[in-house]
């Protein structure tokens, strides 16, 4: 189950042009977004560790997104 709140995901879908959004659709997108965010975060943590740091910096996130 996704930890991301459903309301912001609902707003994103509406911003994309939907007039109505089912709860199941918003939950499914929230789960997918959370999985993608965790994937990026894990890569960023690995990059920070590789650089000898404990702190994840914006550069780590940018590089993780590009890879």
UniProtKB/Swiss-Prot annotation:
It comes from the Archaea. It is found in: Cytoplasm; Chromosome. SUPFAM superfamilies: Histone-fold. GO terms for molecular function: DNA binding; protein heterodimerization activity. InterPro entries: Archaeal_histone_HMF, CBFA_NFYB_domain, Histone-fold, HmfB-like, TAF_TATA-bd_Histone-like_dom. One of its GO terms (cellular component) is chromosome. It holds the Pfam family CBFD_NFYB_HMF. Keywords: Chromosome, Cytoplasm, DNA-binding. Residues 20-22, 54-57 are annotated as: Interaction with DNA. Binds and compact DNA (95 to 150 base pairs) to form nucleosome-like structures that contain positive DNA supercoils. Increases the resistance of DNA to thermal denaturation. Belongs to the archaeal histone HMF family. Homodimer or heterodimer with another histone. Dimers then assemble into higher oligomers, with the DNA wrapped around the protein core. NCBIfam families: archaea_histone. This is Archaeal histone B.
